[in-house]
């Protein structure tokens, strides 16, 4: 018997926690339970209400169809306000389960584990074996005829020319590998040096990625490295063709000047000879 003089029991939070957890779980179960019947007005009930027939007798053959809620796993829209309820999983999940088992064994894994040690004999890594600098040892850039001599360098050079009216045009651009400036009044200017430096910084990345390790045969290159290698070869060919066309254009200009001077000389000599006679 507890009296006012009896010592008060000490507070024990463990019992209260157990009691509150059990009460919380019971309330959650009651709240998350799906009702057996929901009306169109929003009212619902869990009573087992059976529908009676014309004679007042209750039949249970349509109990599950009219009272219980059957939630299908999949609803397929057929069109024309029609749908199909199925219990099967979607085709994507069925295909994935047919290829990849749900419970793989120890030796079968879905994702390959990356190796802890990577060796150069098995993996492709770029190296600094090939020089990618387009600048000579004396510090001068490559222009004019030096392009033909240094065609094997890693860097792809874009020679820029300036028209007589000051409009700059690129002889070789990344988006148009066959663009060649064949105007008759092309002169190199100071803007070409600045454009060379900008183009050099832009192409350093591709040149560094293209450099592969020493001793790697061409058959072992990855597709990305092969694409970069083909781009470099096309750039070299385009550079040589550009240099040849520039030389041909300059030679044509020189021949025109020589022909004009020679024709003017013979015309003047003819006029002087006629005047003398």
From Swiss-Prot:
<protein>
    <recommendedName>
        <fullName>Transport and Golgi organization protein 11</fullName>
    </recommendedName>
</protein>
<dbReference type="GO" id="GO:0005741">
    <property type="term" value="C:mitochondrial outer membrane"/>
</dbReference>
<dbReference type="GO" id="GO:0016559">
    <property type="term" value="P:peroxisome fission"/>
</dbReference>
<feature type="modified residue" description="Phosphoserine">
    <location>
        <position position="190"/>
    </location>
</feature>
<keyword id="KW-1000">Mitochondrion outer membrane</keyword>
<keyword id="KW-0576">Peroxisome</keyword>
<keyword id="KW-0812">Transmembrane</keyword>
<feature type="modified residue" description="Phosphothreonine">
    <location>
        <position position="222"/>
    </location>
</feature>
<feature type="modified residue" description="Phosphoserine">
    <location>
        <position position="179"/>
    </location>
</feature>
<keyword id="KW-0496">Mitochondrion</keyword>
<dbReference type="Pfam" id="PF05644">
    <property type="entry name" value="Miff"/>
</dbReference>
<feature type="topological domain" description="Cytoplasmic">
    <location>
        <begin position="1"/>
        <end position="256"/>
    </location>
</feature>
<dbReference type="GO" id="GO:0009306">
    <property type="term" value="P:protein secretion"/>
</dbReference>
<feature type="modified residue" description="Phosphoserine">
    <location>
        <position position="133"/>
    </location>
</feature>
<keyword id="KW-0472">Membrane</keyword>
<keyword id="KW-0256">Endoplasmic reticulum</keyword>
<comment type="similarity">
    <text>Belongs to the Tango11 family.</text>
</comment>
<feature type="coiled-coil region">
    <location>
        <begin position="225"/>
        <end position="253"/>
    </location>
</feature>
<dbReference type="GO" id="GO:0005789">
    <property type="term" value="C:endoplasmic reticulum membrane"/>
</dbReference>
<feature type="topological domain" description="Lumenal">
    <location>
        <begin position="275"/>
        <end position="277"/>
    </location>
</feature>
<feature type="compositionally biased region" description="Polar residues">
    <location>
        <begin position="174"/>
        <end position="200"/>
    </location>
</feature>
<dbReference type="GO" id="GO:0005737">
    <property type="term" value="C:cytoplasm"/>
</dbReference>
<feature type="modified residue" description="Phosphothreonine">
    <location>
        <position position="216"/>
    </location>
</feature>
<keyword id="KW-1133">Transmembrane helix</keyword>
<feature type="modified residue" description="Phosphoserine">
    <location>
        <position position="182"/>
    </location>
</feature>
<dbReference type="InterPro" id="IPR008518">
    <property type="entry name" value="Mff/Tango-11"/>
</dbReference>
<feature type="region of interest" description="Disordered">
    <location>
        <begin position="167"/>
        <end position="200"/>
    </location>
</feature>
<feature type="modified residue" description="Phosphoserine">
    <location>
        <position position="127"/>
    </location>
</feature>
<dbReference type="InterPro" id="IPR039433">
    <property type="entry name" value="Mff-like_dom"/>
</dbReference>
<dbReference type="GO" id="GO:0000266">
    <property type="term" value="P:mitochondrial fission"/>
</dbReference>
<feature type="modified residue" description="Phosphoserine">
    <location>
        <position position="132"/>
    </location>
</feature>
<feature type="modified residue" description="Phosphothreonine">
    <location>
        <position position="177"/>
    </location>
</feature>
<feature type="modified residue" description="Phosphoserine">
    <location>
        <position position="129"/>
    </location>
</feature>
<dbReference type="GO" id="GO:0005777">
    <property type="term" value="C:peroxisome"/>
</dbReference>
<feature type="region of interest" description="Disordered">
    <location>
        <begin position="124"/>
        <end position="148"/>
    </location>
</feature>
<keyword id="KW-0597">Phosphoprotein</keyword>
<dbReference type="GO" id="GO:0005783">
    <property type="term" value="C:endoplasmic reticulum"/>
</dbReference>
<comment type="function">
    <text>May play a role in mitochondrial and peroxisomal fission.</text>
</comment>
<feature type="transmembrane region" description="Helical; Anchor for type IV membrane protein">
    <location>
        <begin position="257"/>
        <end position="274"/>
    </location>
</feature>
<keyword id="KW-0175">Coiled coil</keyword>
